[in-house]
């Protein structure tokens, strides 16, 4: 499921109107409508996290639906890649 459809489904399950949801996020309803209809890419990380919080869902699930790693995991993955490359090349 794409991010917009995922969030719309969760929002509707909670009985939250789209205009009210956008207002809670501090963005225009028109912009959020475009996100839910997949006319816009998923929003910035802070909006994904805030949307998950409002909906009471795991933020990691929302990031996965947005085809992104959560910010803390990005750093960890980067560190692992650097460590692997150092070990593979014998770099100290």
Specify the residue positions occupied by each region the protein language model found.
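A short, Lys/Arg-rich alpha-helix, primarily the initiator
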Residues: 1-13
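Residues within the helices of the helix-turn-helix
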Residues: 8, 19, 49
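The alpha-helix within a helix-turn-helix
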Residues: 11, 22, 52
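Short alpha-helical DNA-recognition segment
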Residues: 15-34
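DNA major-groove recognition helix of helix-turn-helix
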Residues: 36, 47, 66
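Short, basic-rich loop-to-helix N-cap that marks the start of a DNA-contacting helix
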Residues: 39-53
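Short, charged recognition helix plus adjacent turn
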Residues: 61-92
């Amino acid at each position: 499921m794409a991010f917009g459809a995922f969030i719309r489904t969760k929002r509707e399950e909670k009985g939250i109107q789209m205009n009210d949801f956008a207002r809670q996020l501090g963005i225009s309803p028109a912009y959020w409508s475009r996100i839910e209809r997949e006319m816009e890419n998923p929003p910035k990380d802070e909006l994904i996290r805030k949307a998950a919080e409002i909906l009471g869902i795991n933020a990691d699930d929302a990031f996965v639906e947005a085809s992104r790693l959560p910010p803390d995991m990005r750093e960890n993955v980067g560190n692992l890649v650097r460590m692997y490359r150092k070990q593979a090349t014998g770099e100290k």
